[in-house]
């Protein structure tokens, strides 16, 4: 704890003579050389002996009383003897010897307490962090004293003023203590500098205009947490960028320095549907090969086109009590030679062998190859009609015949007994009258084992089960209804065939 030199030393010694001797010994000993050392916090080492508290002084004095006589040295006697003035005569010599003995005992006790307190102060000083203002103030005072006298003179009043801060305040100093209302004792110069900067009462002080706090808000970013009124609006700015609506068929220009290759010439023509008499025409989106245009829709090559035979529409309002049929989904698949033909077509288009044909694929799928060859195509200046027909045939073969679209097949729909069979030997319905018994006996080419317009088997007189034109018969006896028969045979009635064969 760094206390005041006057009060602490008076409590320890109660003698003004010894205080004068101690200050004089410090000046003569050259202890003030450590004043400019930043590692010692700008305090002299000789004053660490007086920097202990009362408890340490009592302990040091009690321990030093036992070894007072043994610790006295000749150098101390000579040192303290030299500090006092000399007296003449024998009486003066006795007084000098008595004073030296008393002062040497006090000097030895202070030196012993100094050795014990320096170790304690070194441990405590490691936790001390001097403020920057106090350090800079002491440096300025030291430099100003050196410039005036050429050395570092220290007076008692100035030294007392520089050691006002206690050791407890140095050990516990932080930002909160420095920023408190209590002024720091070593910040006199800083306070003076601040006073110089503040204007006088008579000076005119210009009031700076107060800038209001502004905030830029996007209308789309407002939420329920914001509360604004009309009077809060200062100005309305247009948006930085407004996206314009752009159609899907718009074209994007490509600069001349772009690496995009030129696309071949596109052909626009009409295909007349002979069945319906309708005309289909698609607008060409590329003008010529001289313009650097690219198609945005060409990014999707494998586009699924609608089927030529739409599925029959069912009335969803009629609820059926029957079970829904089990259907099998056939995924979209490609032919094994699809990629080969696709690579050939792409290579020919890049080399301008085949032109880019703009045609409705839905209508092209309905045409046959012979109809494509017989099309009347308007002559183009850069492309021949044969190249256009070859491009149409290649496109139809690639995207219509080699691509199997996704569809739902009824489970077992492709089995023979679920197909639609028709009679080939009888095309006319028989008379509604009773059939003669000799009809089956005569060898008639139009006869059949199954009655064409009846569901009764001819050789079963006691059954009314229908015999289908195509099916399977169980040859073995079924012992368990849950198990499948051991032997089955498929049959087709004579004179009946699949409707696809006609």
Swiss-Prot record:
It comes from the Eukaryota. It is found in: Cytoplasm; Nucleus. Transmembrane segments: none annotated. Signal peptide: none annotated. GO terms for cellular component: cytoplasm; nucleus. Keywords: Cytoplasm, Nucleus. GO terms for biological process: intracellular signal transduction. Present with 1055 molecules/cell in log phase SD medium. This is Protein GIS3. It comes from Saccharomyces cerevisiae (strain ATCC 204508 / S288c) (Baker's yeast). The lineage of its organism: Eukaryota, Fungi, Dikarya, Ascomycota, Saccharomycotina. The gene is GIS3.
